[in-house]
Amino acid sequence: FGVYRYGLHAFLVILISVASAVLAEYLFDLVAKHPNTIRDGSAVVTGLLLALSLSPTVPLYIPCIGSIFAILFVKCFFGGLGRNFMNPALTGRCFLLISFGSAMTDFHIDGVSSATPIAALKAGEAVDVAAEFLGFAPSVIGGSALALLIGGIFLCITGGITFEIPLSFIVVFTAFMGLFGGNGFDPVYLFAQICGGGILMGAFFMATDPVTSPVTRKGQLLFGGIVGLLSGLFRVLGSSA
């Protein structure tokens, strides 16, 4: 949907991000004389998730740098898949946000520089919740809440992920925003908070990383709740939306 919404540049961001991740892993295995691991698909997933978390207007060198950092410094240098102590895609995004902050937070779309729905909420402005839910509000490439929900539910049904982490993440985040977000438990406000700012992507696709998340049901519920709480804290107290 992000490619449909944002066009060729968004497609190139995704393509470069995935290709850079795969190439970085291939070259590392070649130089280190390790068995080739690109066929497991994890590099593709890392590149795709990183690309979907980026602004559709980022310069094309940014997804390349982010994917290479994620694969080499977060995954390969720690022993490869199953040994990384952080989510590669999420860590790559954090690295890019620190290194290229202005480009990462620029949503200059259709010739107009627009605030994201979450930035508008923090400023006390009205938000088009329907546009945010469907993915037509200024956001990252993978910012359609509807598409993220469909993908997340599909993964839960097919066993790709378990429901405990997303459920506890969203429940705790929603409760925190209701208590401390400044608008009480207004359903429209809470719905807008859930649909924006990467909450659904984090709940379904980042926090559920099988390598860096707990394996027991209780651990998953606790982990999801803690991440949801931290997301609420960052949303309320953080300077960046």
Regions found by a protein language model. Give the residues of each.
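N-terminal signal-anchor module of multipass membrane proteins
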Residues: F1-V18, V22
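Alpha-helical transmembrane segments and their membrane-interface exit regions
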Residues: A19-L27, I68-F78, R93-I98, V172-G178, ...
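C-terminal ends of transmembrane helices
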Residues: V22-P35, I71-G82, I150-G160, F204-S213
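Short, amphipathic, aromatic/basic-enriched membrane-interface segments that mark the entry/exit
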Residues: D29-R39, T57-V58, F133-G142, I157-E164, ...
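Hydrophobic alpha-helical bundle architecture
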Residues: S53, F154-E164, M177-A241
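Long hydrophobic alpha-helical segments that form multi-pass transmembrane helix bundles
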Residues: G82-L149
